[in-house]
Amino acid sequence: MTFMEFEKLRHGTELIKRGFARMQKGGVIMDVTTPEQARIAEEAGAVAVMALQAVPADLRKAGGVARMADPEIVQQIIDTVTIPVMAKARIGHFVEAEILEALGVDMVDESEVLTPADPFYHIDKTQFTVPFVCGARNLGEALRRINEGAAMIRTKGEAGTGDVSQAVKHMKQIQGEIRALAGKTKEELIMVAREIEAPIELVVETAKMQRLPVVNFAAGGVATPADAALMMRLGADGVFVGSGIFKAENPEKMAKAVVEAVNNYDNPAKLAEISKGVGAGMKGISADMIPVQEALQERGW
């Protein structure tokens, strides 16, 4: 495949953008803050890396305003690895997204991990040629983001905690709401669309497919190979790992183990071998201990 052919494949119409997102299915996407970390992620088998100024655990600890990563660092990461490079922009900050698109990132994450820029609106992602990924806690949030042009959805979870419980909650919430659509009449689906504030066309499509119209990855608190396998068993199309890699005792071993766990998520014996000797995971914090006003998952609507 030539460079130009790949450019056409990853950017463009909604169909092409969704197709590029689908190409990451079954893989692990890792948060990185430096070219060196990006290289570790690639060598471990990550399908893509996510560039940001600091991993969520550090952003949570530091407080203040969290913004997109320095474009120079993003460019260095792009130049360092051969796998796709994604980067985070603040909710509603379309200029950050435009800058990242101009840099040549493969996907933009309109992320609640960063400090939201717009208290009213998310980015109109249909105006971009680069695909977007967005977080969601329930079916309404997921379909609203897809209606805005998101090519991939991920659970919000509670980033930077190392506690997978919220990612589990959000994955089960979305899937439960999708199952509840089965067998409903058109009139009943219209009522559901009103209740969850989502376009009826997307509700009907989701009901027919019995899954989201785009890939749905797990994110937010995945910290061990077992966590990654759990999310795959629950129906995730792939896994984002943020602080769980580079806050672990041995990032290189943890990165490789998480990738292997996703590849062998339905094989307990293999998972047992994969999990041996990887070192301690990130210390983390229980998501239940975080006040609602400080929960990152509450950002966006």
From Swiss-Prot:
Transmembrane spans: none
Q: Which SUPFAM superfamilies match?
A: Ribulose-phoshate binding barrel
What CDD domains would the database entry show?
Answer: pdxS
**Active-site residues, as the UniProt record annotates them:** 88 (schiff-base intermediate with d-ribose 5-phosphate)
Q: Which residues bind D-ribose 5-phosphate?
A: 31, 160, 221, 242-243
Q: Which Gene3D superfamilies match?
A: Aldolase class I
Name the keywords, alphabetized. Answer: Lyase, Pyridoxal phosphate, Schiff base
Uppermost EC category: lyase
Which residues are involved in binding D-glyceraldehyde 3-phosphate?
172
Record has Lyase as a keyword: yes
Biological or metabolic pathway of the protein: Cofactor biosynthesis; pyridoxal 5'-phosphate biosynthesis
Q: What does this protein do?
A: Catalyzes the formation of pyridoxal 5'-phosphate from ribose 5-phosphate (RBP), glyceraldehyde 3-phosphate (G3P) and ammonia. The ammonia is provided by the PdxT subunit. Can also use ribulose 5-phosphate and dihydroxyacetone phosphate as substrates, resulting from enzyme-catalyzed isomerization of RBP and G3P, respectively.
Q: Which family does it belong to?
A: Belongs to the PdxS/SNZ family.
Q: Which HAMAP family match?
A: PdxS
Q: Which PANTHER family match?
A: PYRIDOXAL 5'-PHOSPHATE SYNTHASE SUBUNIT SNZ1-RELATED (PTHR31829:SF0)
Name recorded for this polypeptide: Pyridoxal 5'-phosphate synthase subunit PdxS
- The source organism is Methanosarcina mazei (strain ATCC BAA-159 / DSM 3647 / Goe1 / Go1 / JCM 11833 / OCM 88) (Methanosarcina frisia)
